Amino acid sequence: MKKTAVLNSHISSAISTLGHYDLLTINDAGMPIPNDDKRIDLAVTKSLPRFIDVLETVLTEMEIQKVYLAEEIKTANAQQLKAIKKLINDDVEIKFIAHSEMKEMLKSPLNKGNIRTGEITPFSNIILESNVTF
């Protein structure tokens, strides 16, 4: 049995395919994720699993250099923003963009996976940009 934190085979596979600058997204239950082979639906019910728990686990196996967050999270979900910032290392750039731009980035060829959680708080979405480990 696998020893590392990510047990979900689809998430593990998506992370293993990442190269420098590739993207992986973690989304709340309401984000309109394209129905394609990159969709990884973990949502079981409201708040299960929580966005922040999935993010924390993914970060144990993924090297990131930048994250994208919706500008709207600053006012609509300051508590979630604070929790995200606790998990992101100081050397990782945080870029705030319009929520509409985030939706478009889900379709990018650089995006290797869209993870849907059961999160039901507004703007609980993040795009992780992969870095190299050397």
UniProtKB/Swiss-Prot annotation:
<dbReference type="InterPro" id="IPR007721">
    <property type="entry name" value="RbsD_FucU"/>
</dbReference>
<keyword id="KW-0119">Carbohydrate metabolism</keyword>
<feature type="active site" description="Proton donor">
    <location>
        <position position="20"/>
    </location>
</feature>
<dbReference type="GO" id="GO:0048029">
    <property type="term" value="F:monosaccharide binding"/>
</dbReference>
<dbReference type="GO" id="GO:0016872">
    <property type="term" value="F:intramolecular lyase activity"/>
</dbReference>
<dbReference type="InterPro" id="IPR023064">
    <property type="entry name" value="D-ribose_pyranase"/>
</dbReference>
<feature type="binding site">
    <location>
        <begin position="123"/>
        <end position="125"/>
    </location>
    <ligand>
        <name>substrate</name>
    </ligand>
</feature>
<dbReference type="InterPro" id="IPR023750">
    <property type="entry name" value="RbsD-like_sf"/>
</dbReference>
<dbReference type="GO" id="GO:0005829">
    <property type="term" value="C:cytosol"/>
</dbReference>
<comment type="function">
    <text>Catalyzes the interconversion of beta-pyran and beta-furan forms of D-ribose.</text>
</comment>
<keyword id="KW-0963">Cytoplasm</keyword>
<keyword id="KW-0413">Isomerase</keyword>
<comment type="similarity">
    <text>Belongs to the RbsD / FucU family. RbsD subfamily.</text>
</comment>
<feature type="binding site">
    <location>
        <position position="99"/>
    </location>
    <ligand>
        <name>substrate</name>
    </ligand>
</feature>
<feature type="binding site">
    <location>
        <position position="28"/>
    </location>
    <ligand>
        <name>substrate</name>
    </ligand>
</feature>
<dbReference type="GO" id="GO:0019303">
    <property type="term" value="P:D-ribose catabolic process"/>
</dbReference>
<comment type="pathway">
    <text>Carbohydrate metabolism; D-ribose degradation; D-ribose 5-phosphate from beta-D-ribopyranose: step 1/2.</text>
</comment>
<protein>
    <recommendedName>
        <fullName>D-ribose pyranase</fullName>
        <ecNumber>5.4.99.62</ecNumber>
    </recommendedName>
</protein>
<comment type="subunit">
    <text>Homodecamer.</text>
</comment>
<dbReference type="GO" id="GO:0062193">
    <property type="term" value="F:D-ribose pyranase activity"/>
</dbReference>
<dbReference type="Pfam" id="PF05025">
    <property type="entry name" value="RbsD_FucU"/>
</dbReference>
